């Protein structure tokens, strides 16, 4: 395997509390990166989950910013070079959508975690839409099988209906809740017996599904039911083919319990075998292939203050082609100048280590002293722009004001850094000059206030503003655009990039504007 074929870069996504951070931790446990997994919610346990590292995340037991972790993994019994696995653990809380959407632009595949009792929830649907838009292959892990949940066939039906994708089980549960005996791994033809243990790995037995040994191991009734259900699975669901998975037509499904380490290794083993290595990336100018000799990459996330003792920013760069080498000058397309990086890093959540080189699929942290914005492209001299880092029209809006006139410099800097990170969107109203923050969820307002106070020593206050929708506008005819902006002056704003934004205060105002000015294009994402 060459360096590109070894790489597996993926995101783990789910609705809040479906067990995503726990699954991430178990992957790290199998990858030998951590010795003990942090029990996520339990405050009695000293260890806080490894992948949640911002203060506010530790307080609440939820992930609010994407963490990047990498480890080497070689499935048992396989020889040769290990796979290099890059995991992007995304926010699960329903308010943290922007960051998650953007993360999905930097991965080659995704694992969706579904709670066996709750099934598909609203956020999972939204994230699946983004995967579909980008043709990202997904594997589904149905979690919490050791608790009472719904019938597996019901959950599979719901997955197909709600996520609009065909599914194919590659493992099957034997009982559930108190009667949960284990799973039969259809992909490997193995029986995995369940012993509730958060640290230890499962007992595996090679068993022919028709043999009497199966009855001895799980009981006659359960064995008969398993045979019947597996027959049904083979009859109802398409035969598994790697091609249909990679082209995002079929989603393989695994069952297990992440908290008890159960079904996780089977998922990881199968994942590294079938998941795609880095795929070509679409730039505005052309398609960029990973095997091209020249380096290219894009910034999909900026994080301030990984270390609160240093006011540092780190820009996360996804490598698309060629080879990244430390200290070599690279062309920053937007700034039209060369930049070099003496201390690029790779991550294990907060622990970072300096690297000398990186390959397509890798995520590299570049020290950022204000030169990067989300979506920036780095190359070896070619002028190109990677597409697909959208901002979605926010759902909630508030005026933001500086609450301490003595700290206006800190307030300004903090707000600018947080907006560059993509925590929320900032619009400046052209009519009254006031700043409006737009977010996808209420919790983001709290995060902004908390981080301004704790990281920048600045205070803000929120004031209500009644807005229905923010849309980016453009027109082929410059005169038409200027006329619209004049006529609708009180509704006009600029975003952080200086683009024109129309802030409609009601659905009526928006639909009338669309009717009266048919030459104006209204966009609900900033990528057009």
Segments from the language model and where they lie:
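Structural and coupling elements of P-loop NTPases
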Residues: 1-528
């Amino acid at each position: 395997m060459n360096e590109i074929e070894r790489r597996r870069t993926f995101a783990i996504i789910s609705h809040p509390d479906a067990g995503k951070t726990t699954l991430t931790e178990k992957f790290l446990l199998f990858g030998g990166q951590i010795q003990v997994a942090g029990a996520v919610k339990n405050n009695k346990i000293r260890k806080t989950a490894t992948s949640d590292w911002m203060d506010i995340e530790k307080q609440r037991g939820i992930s609010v910013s994407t963490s990047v972790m990498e480890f080497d993994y070689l499935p048992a019994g396989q020889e040769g070079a290990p796979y290099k696995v890059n995991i992007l653990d995304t926010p699960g809380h329903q308010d943290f959508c922007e960051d998650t959407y953007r993360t999905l632009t930097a991965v080659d595949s995704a694992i969706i975690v579904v709670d066996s009792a709750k099934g598909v929830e609203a956020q999972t649907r939204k994230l699946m839409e983004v995967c579909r838009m980008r043709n990202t292959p997904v594997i589904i892990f149905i979690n919490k099988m050791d608790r009472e949940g719904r019938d597996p066939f019901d959950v599979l039906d719901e997955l197909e209906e709600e996520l609009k994708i065909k599914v194919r089980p590659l493992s099957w549960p034997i009982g559930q809740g108190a009667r949960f005996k284990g799973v039969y791994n259809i992909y490997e033809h193995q029986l995995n017996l369940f012993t509730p243990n958060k640290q230890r790995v499962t007992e595996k037995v090679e068993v022919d599904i028709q043999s009497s040994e199966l009855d001895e191991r799980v009981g006659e009734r359960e064995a008969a039911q398993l045979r019947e259900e597996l027959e049904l699975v083979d009859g109802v669901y398409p035969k598994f083919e790697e091609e249909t998975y990679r082209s995002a037509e079929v989603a393989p499904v695994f069952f297990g319990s992440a908290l008890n380490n159960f079904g996780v290794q089977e998922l990881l083993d199968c994942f590294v075998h079938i998941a795609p290595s880095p795929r070509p990336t679409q730039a505005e100018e052309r398609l960029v292939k990973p095997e091209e000799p020249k380096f290219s990459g894009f910034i999909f996330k900026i994080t301030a203050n990984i270390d609160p003792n240093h006011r540092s920013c780190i820009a996360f760069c996804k490598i698309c082609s060629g080879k990244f080498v430390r200290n070599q000058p690279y062309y920053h397309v937007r700034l039209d100048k060369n930049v070099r990086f003496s201390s690029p890093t790779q991550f294990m959540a907060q622990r970072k280590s300096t690297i000398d080189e990186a390959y397509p699929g890798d995520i590299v942290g570049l020290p950022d002293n204000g030169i990067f914005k989300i979506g920036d492209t780095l190359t070896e001299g070619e002028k190109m722009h990677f597409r697909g880092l959208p901002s979605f029209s926010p759902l909630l809006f508030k005026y933001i004001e500086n609450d301490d006139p003595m700290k206006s410099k800190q307030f300004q800097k903090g707000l600018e850094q947080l907006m560059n990170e993509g925590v929320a969107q900032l619009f400046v109203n052209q009519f009254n000059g006031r700043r409006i923050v737009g977010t996808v969820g209420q919790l983001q307002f709290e995060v902004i206030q908390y981080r301004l106070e704790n990281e920048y020593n600045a205070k803000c206050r929120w004031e209500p503003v009644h807005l229905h929708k923010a849309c980016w506008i453009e027109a082929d005819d410059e005169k038409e655009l200027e006329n619209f902006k004049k006529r609708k002056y009180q509704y006009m704003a600029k975003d952080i990039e200086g683009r024109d934004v129309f802030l409609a205060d009601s659905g009526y105002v928006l639909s009338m504007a669309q009717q009266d000015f048919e030459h104006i294009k209204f966009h609900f994402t900033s990528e057009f």
